């Protein structure tokens, strides 16, 4: 008996909508400069781009649907895999949304530690951006220097939480661990060297003719275009809008620290590069202030790291091991999950790449009824449709680099 395979591939002629003398070039999805699984369909007339169509979805994992089938604490490690270059920012955004939903107030010492983790994460993300963008354009020395400094920060994070990339270092209600004395010492050592390191990067890049050729007056985004596409973070600030959620809608203790919001009205690749460099300097200022705030917490004997809310948060480990009620409550929270009240909340935070938002709809059950992620990289990928036309193929790499997109949060 002959067995016929009913799954034989079916082929058809694919026609592209293109003008005469136009060529369609596929950039990616395996291109080393695509910053992940990005495919661009570029319509070319000779080497000039006339149309660009981003094609996404190659890394889709269904995170929003996964959240609907996980208890709230169970979803926390999944957020690490969104923008995996800045995982603590994702952890924090989700934790803050749940805390707002249930009306939880986090202890001050935990807030200070969270701010430290967030700003260290911002520096790690910006250094990674600088390294990879410089490498894409050919400045390998800066790539090596920036990765050297990022490695130092990864060692600090590893000493705190045991992980170097996907940290899961923030909990709903606070933080699981206090920082060690070596953490502060190592961080101060890094921060003392950072201004000179940033100056070294600028000295190497600002005199590099190829870097300037690919940066100045390339990939210009007007203020109106940035706003209409929903840009945020450095992409928006480089186009003339001085909007930073840490300033405009402060969370944690950002209203108690002094820092500047750098911005530019030029809107080109070079302006975005300058914003990233200035933001690293501002993050260092914030970290110095958080170190002082932490030392004041120690002096004032503010020791609590987790909020006290037995209905939603497990008791301290010592209580769980010695008190019957705390043990039972912990068992229920771990096996069945917390049950936030019926309601909905949207919380936006300033991730290294822009506005990271979490929308949660609760129907009073242990699982979110609906969870929606607002990832900045998604919108910064879409704007390539308007930026790329009028540029040449070599400019594509530098423009993609300065958008700083990560496809873990684009596809989700």
Swiss-Prot record:
Membrane topology, as annotated: Peripheral membrane protein
Gene Ontology molecular functions: NAD binding; NADH:ubiquinone reductase (non-electrogenic) activity; quinone binding
Keyword NAD set for record: yes
Keyword Cell membrane: yes
One GO cellular component term: plasma membrane
Chief localisation class: membrane
Gene3D superfamilies: Cytochrome-c3 Hydrogenase, chain B (1.10.645.10)
Keyword vocabulary terms for this entry: Cell inner membrane, Cell membrane, Membrane, NAD, Quinone, Translocase, Transport, Ubiquinone
Reactions catalysed according to its record: a quinone + NADH + 5 H(+)(in) = a quinol + NAD(+) + 4 H(+)(out)
EC number annotated for this UniProt entry: 7.1.1.-
Signal sequence bounds: none
Transmembrane segments: none
Compartments where located: Cell inner membrane
Family designation: Belongs to the complex I 49 kDa subunit family.
Function comment: NDH-1 shuttles electrons from NADH, via FMN and iron-sulfur (Fe-S) centers, to quinones in the respiratory chain. The immediate electron acceptor for the enzyme in this species is believed to be ubiquinone. Couples the redox reaction to proton translocation (for every two electrons transferred, four hydrogen ions are translocated across the cytoplasmic membrane), and thus conserves the redox energy in a proton gradient.
Quaternary structure and interacting proteins, as annotated: NDH-1 is composed of 14 different subunits. Subunits NuoB, C, D, E, F, and G constitute the peripheral sector of the complex.
Protein's UniProt name: NADH-quinone oxidoreductase subunit D
Protein source organism: Sulfurimonas denitrificans (strain ATCC 33889 / DSM 1251) (Thiomicrospira denitrificans (strain ATCC 33889 / DSM 1251))
């Amino acid at each position: 008996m002959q067995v016929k395979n009913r799954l034989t591939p079916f082929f058809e002629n694919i026609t592209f909508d293109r003008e005469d003398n136009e060529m369609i070039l596929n950039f990616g999805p395996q291109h080393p400069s695509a910053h992940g699984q990005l495919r661009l369909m570029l319509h070319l007339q000779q080497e000039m781009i006339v149309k660009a169509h981003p094609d996404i979805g190659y890394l889709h994992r269904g995170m929003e649907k996964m959240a609907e089938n996980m208890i709230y604490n169970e979803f926390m490690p999944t957020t690490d895999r969104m923008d995996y270059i800045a995982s603590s920012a994702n952890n924090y955004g989700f934790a803050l949304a749940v805390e707002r939903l249930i009306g939880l107030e986090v202890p001050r010492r935990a807030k200070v530690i969270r701010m430290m983790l967030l700003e260290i994460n911002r520096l790690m993300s910006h250094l990674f951006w600088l390294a990879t963008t410089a490498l894409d354009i050919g400045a390998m020395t800066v790539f090596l220097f920036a990765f050297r400094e990022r490695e130092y920060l990864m060692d600090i994070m590893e000493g705190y939480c045991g992980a170097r990339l996907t940290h899961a270092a923030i909990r709903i209600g606070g933080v699981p661990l206090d920082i060690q004395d070596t953490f502060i010492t190592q961080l101060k050592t890094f921060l003392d060297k950072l201004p000179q390191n940033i100056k070294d990067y600028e000295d190497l890049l600002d005199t590099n003719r190829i870097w300037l050729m690919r940066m100045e007056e390339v990939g210009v985004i007007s203020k109106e275009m940035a706003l209409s596409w929903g840009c945020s973070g450095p992409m928006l600030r480089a186009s003339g809008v001085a909007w930073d959620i840490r300033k405009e809608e402060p969370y944690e203790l950002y209203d108690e620290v002094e820092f500047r919001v750098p911005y530019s009205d030029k809107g080109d690749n070079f302006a975005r590069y300058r914003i990233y460099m200035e933001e690293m300097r501002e993050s260092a200022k914030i970290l110095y202030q958080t170190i002082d705030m932490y030392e004041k917490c120690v002096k004032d004997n503010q020791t609590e790291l987790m909020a006290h809310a037995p209905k939603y948060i497990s008791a301290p480990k010592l209580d769980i091991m010695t008190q019957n009620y705390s043990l039972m409550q912990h068992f229920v929270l771990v096996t069945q999950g917390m049950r936030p009240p019926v309601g909905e909340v949207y919380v936006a935070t300033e991730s290294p790449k822009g506005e990271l938002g979490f929308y949660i709809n609760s129907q009073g059950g242990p699982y979110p009824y609906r969870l929606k992620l607002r990832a900045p990289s998604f919108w910064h990928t879409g704007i390539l449709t308007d930026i790329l036309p009028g540029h040449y193929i070599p400019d594509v790499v530098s423009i993609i680099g300065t958008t700083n997109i990560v496809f873990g949060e684009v596809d989700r």
